[in-house]
Every structure is written in C-alpha cells, then in structure tokens.
Amino acid sequence: MSFIKTDDNVKLFYESTGKGEPIIFVHEFAGDYRSWEPQINYLSRYYQCISFCARGYPPSEVPENESSYSQERAWRDILSVMDNLQVEKAHIVGLSMGGFATLHLGINAQDRVLSLVIAGCGYGAIPIDKTNFNKEADFSNISLDSAKIILNKGMD
C-alpha cells in the first residue's frame, strides 16, 4: 500500500499506474479510489492515472478532529498528492464531493492544473437563500442516511 503525508500530516492512500501526462481522480462521498477503476483501466494505457482515498476514507487516515475536514482541506489534499508524487501539473477529474474539491483546486491553484473535468458539483445555490437550499436538498439527512448505510453494510 502506498501513502503520502499531507501538509497537515494526515496519511492518504493512493495508487498510481501508467505513464504519460498525469490525471488525478477525486472520488465522491460514497466512493473511494476504486470508484475510478473502469476509467483508469482504459486511460492508464496513455496517461499516468492517480487515484486516492480522501481523508476520512480508509485506508487513508481518519482524523477525529472535525477541524481536519473542510473544502479547503479537500483541495489542499489534492495538492499534497501532487507534491508528494512530484506532479507539477495534472488533469483533475472530480465527481460530486470530489467535484467540489476539484473546482476549488482550479480556482485556488490554476498554475497546477492542465484541465478540469467536474461532474455532479451542485446546482449553484445562492448563498443568501440557505434555508430554501436546505429544504430542497435535505442534504444533512441524506448524508447521514448514506453514512449509516456505509457504516453498516460497507462500500463493496
């Protein structure tokens, strides 16, 4: 198993395969590095494909402190993967939760990105309308229900 350390000293599990221009795959809430297996199986013939488990997703470290988790931490973790693997620039592919991290990386570290592929990143809710957004999305209950299912049944 291969691990890197983030700039705040959290161990992240990663896999890298193939040669060529690097593509980094960032998984969704209910996934992990394996979510990208079909894409990596094909694209690793032509590119260096890197996938990793976000913090909180074993075998990556699961910090207990809530302050260890944020949108900023998520995009900085992508940079930590790049830095540890000596990847100067990469194509970044993110889905859902990983899409948000990918979007934030593109905004905050444009010089490290060759391209962004972002899917399921949200519908662009207006921040001042948080009450209506929460009613529409019911995000906290959906997330809690998903977490309970994963905890009880696992991810396989």
Q: Which residues make up each language-model segment?
A:
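Flexible "cap/lid" loop of the alpha/beta hydrolase fold
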Residues: L103, I107-N108, L114-I149
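Alpha/beta-hydrolase active-site loop signature
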Residues: A30, A54-P58, Y123
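Active-site loop/oxyanion-hole signature of alpha/beta-hydrolase fold enzymes
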Residues: N41, I50-V93
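Alpha/beta-hydrolase fold catalytic core
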Residues: M1-I23, R45-Y47
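Serine-hydrolase catalytic-loop signature spanning alpha/beta hydrolases and amidase-signature enzymes
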Residues: E28-P38, C49
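Active-site glycine-rich loops that stabilize anionic/oxyanionic intermediates
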Residues: K19-G20, E28-G31, S96
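Gly/Ala-rich beta-loop-alpha elbow adjacent to hydrolase catalytic centers
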Residues: G94-G98, T102
